[in-house]
């Protein structure tokens, strides 16, 4: 999956803005190229996990369809931990058709990786930043 630089900048800024709470959203695009980020409120307001509101997920899907885009990944930040899936991330990654992108802000160093997860196991990792 290729993430346009402008999208990477947007999610970095959103993650910094929301810290220390985990920030989250969806990555939208076509043909494995991400062209937009769709931010969603972390309704858990937690520093260690996130949840999307069902109404926000529906709105995101409706928006993507209106633009002719697909949901290619969901993304969230790890304000104080590495850019790798936690046990909870692996447990909740239930769609093998999308990637799971994690942006780390640990120690002021930014890292963005995305993962394919199948049956609770990482089966593919891509480093983006």
Predicted regions and their residues:
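Residue-level "edge-of-site" marker
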Residues: 77
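Conserved beta-strand-loop surface patch within small alpha/beta domains used
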Residues: 1-71, 80-129
């Amino acid at each position: 999956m290729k993430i346009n630089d402008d999208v990477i900048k947007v999610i970095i800024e959103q993650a910094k803005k929301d810290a220390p709470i985990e920030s989250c959203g969806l990555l939208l695009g076509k043909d494995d190229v991400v062209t937009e980020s769709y931010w969603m409120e972390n309704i858990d307001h937690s520093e260690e996990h996130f949840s999307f509101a069902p109404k926000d997920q529906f709105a995101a899907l409706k928006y993507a369809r209106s633009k002719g885009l697909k949901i290619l990944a969901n993304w969230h930040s790890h304000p104080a931990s590495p850019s790798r899936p936690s046990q909870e991330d692996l447990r909740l990654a239930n769609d093998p058709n999308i990637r799971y992108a994690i942006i780390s802000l640990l120690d002021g160093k930014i890292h963005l990786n995305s993962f394919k997860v199948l049956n609770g196991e990482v089966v593919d990792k891509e480093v983006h930043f």
